[in-house]
């Protein structure tokens, strides 16, 4: 039976979610809320949604499922608003926030006793692009879509959500909200602090050591890429998960002090063990499997400095969807190849590797 889905927030995540729902459920009516007229117009023009509004409360009573794809503070504010609306009995309310405890706690506080169901959620996908204009039906492919059930989740809710979101081609997983926040503080939130701190430190250092800007490439670029993330979103994330993140900061300070002491003492064995353990631990992690934020599939090609060589590669890959192509101008040991090509899914990556290796003698490396 066709359902009515209401997505509040037509940014990259919300709009991409609408496309994924439409892919598997073309008969579902998708309603959209966004304050921006431009985002609403794009979503309507591209067929992501069927109707749009800038008045959140107006569409909520019509929905069988409501998804709040909004900043954390606004999500909590809208949960409070939903508690005072005449919603359909048994309506499912979910969200797409990057931290979960504050949102789940708010839902259990304000929606308790209401004839609704609530399940927290965090689709771990993203891009450096933003807005409805950047929506991508394949954004969530093979990425983790985390559910954090609450006391209001109820029977069959998760099954209904998995069915609704089947067109996202994501990997669904359930985890406790507090454990979610502990885990993401370490592997997502704290790394953003590190990247931004390293970038800020380098910018100040480069004022006296100008060549630092010119030499920054390879590993530095990889480590600081996420420093370009949207500051408002990350301010909200850190403040909604502050205790756990502060714990990670203190833990890191201790580890950094240990390394500093080893260097000061000239303890070669401790320094070697530090790097070797990190290398072994990284190799043992599932970090090379796709499932996290901003997933892409990268292929590196060592190409000669010849005219039209990039054009030749692109001709071979005609019909393959590329996310990005980058020419590494420096010949550095920490760069896998001169030409870096990024794909959205494993199928395109494998096809590209096959085409290039079969038709050229270039060395191809998959990272």
Label each region the model flagged.
Residues 57-86, 91-92, 98:
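Rossmann-like NAD(P)-binding element
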Residues 139-226:
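Internal alpha-helical scaffold of NAD(P)-dependent oxidoreductase catalytic cores
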Residues 80-132:
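Rossmann-like NAD(P)(H) cofactor-binding subdomain of soluble oxidoreductases
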Residues 208-275:
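Interdomain hinge/lid region at the active-site interface
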Residues 281-367:
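A conserved regulatory-domain signal marking ACT and ACT-like small-molecule sensing domains
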Residues 267-285, 289:
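Small-residue-rich helix-loop
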């Amino acid at each position: 039976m066709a359902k009515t889905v209401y997505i509040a927030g037509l940014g990259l995540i919300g709009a991409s979610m609408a496309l994924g729902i439409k892919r598997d459920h073309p008969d579902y009516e998708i309603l959209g809320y966004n304050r921006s007229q431009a985002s609403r117009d794009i979503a309507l023009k591209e067929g992501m949604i069927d109707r749009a509004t800038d008045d959140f409360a107006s569409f909520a009573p019509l929905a069988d499922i409501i998804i709040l794809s909004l900043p954390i503070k606004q999500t909590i504010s809208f949960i409070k608003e939903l508690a005072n609306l005449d919603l359909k009995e048994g309506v499912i309310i979910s969200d797409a926030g990057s931290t979960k405890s504050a949102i789940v706690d708010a839902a259990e506080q304000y929606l308790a006793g209401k004839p609704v169901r609530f399940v927290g959620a965090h689709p771990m996908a993203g891009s450096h692009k933003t807005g409805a204009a950047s929506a991508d039906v394949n954004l969530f492919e093979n990425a983790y879509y985390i559910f954090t059930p609450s006391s209001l989740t109820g029977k069959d809710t998760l099954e209904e959500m998995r069915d609704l979101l089947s067109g996202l081609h994501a990997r669904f997983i359930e985890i406790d909200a507090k454990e979610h926040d502990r885990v993401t503080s370490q592997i997502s939130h704290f790394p953003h602090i590190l990247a931004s701190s390293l970038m800020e430190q380098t910018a100040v250092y480069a004022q006296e050591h100008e060549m630092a800007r010119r030499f920054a490439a390879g590993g530095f670029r990889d480590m600081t890429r996420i420093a370009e993330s949207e500051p408002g979103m990350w301010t909200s994330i850190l403040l909604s998960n502050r205790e756990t993140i502060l714990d990670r900061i203190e833990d890191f300070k201790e580890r950094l002090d240990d390394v500093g002491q080893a260097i000061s003492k000239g303890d070669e064995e401790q320094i070697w063990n530090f790097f070797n353990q990190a290398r072994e631990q990284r190799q043992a992690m599932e970090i090379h499997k796709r499932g996290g934020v901003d997933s892409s599939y990268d292929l590196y090609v060592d190409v000669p400095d010849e005219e039209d060589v990039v054009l030749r590669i692109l001709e071979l890959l005609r019909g393959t969807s590329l996310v990005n192509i980058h020419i590494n101008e420096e010949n550095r040991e920490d760069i896998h190849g001169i030409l870096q090509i990024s794909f959205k899914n494993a199928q395109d990556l494998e096809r590209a590797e096959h085409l290039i290796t079969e038709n050229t003698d270039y060395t191809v490396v998959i990272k």
